Curated annotation (Swiss-Prot):
Disulfide bonds join C21-C59, C25-C48, C34-C57, C38-C58. It comes from Arabidopsis thaliana (Mouse-ear cress). One of its GO terms (biological process) is killing of cells of another organism. Keywords: Antimicrobial, Disulfide bond, Fungicide, Plant defense. Belongs to the DEFL family. Pfam families: Defensin (PF24552). This is Putative defensin-like protein 72. The keyword Cell inner membrane does not apply.
Length: 61
């Protein structure tokens, strides 16, 4: 039940409204790399989001 609620919440707002995922995050590609890449692409913010171990670098408008 709790997982179902979490999945529905993530589908509704994709984490924190990060709507464009550009890459898989790894130990060498974390928030400190993801955020500048998103900003360079014209987005306002970026971060590694998702459920472990499948974090994705996603950008926010």
């Amino acid at each position: 039940m709790k997982l179902s609620i979490l999945v529905k919440a993530m589908k509704r707002n994709n984490g924190f409204r990060y709507d464009y995922c550009i890459a898989e995050c790894s130990e060498h590609f974390l928030d400190d790399v993801c955020k500048p890449v998103c900003i360079d692409k014209g987005y306002s913010d970026g971060g590694c989001i998702g459920l472990a171990p499948n974090f994705k670098c996603c950008c926010k408008k």
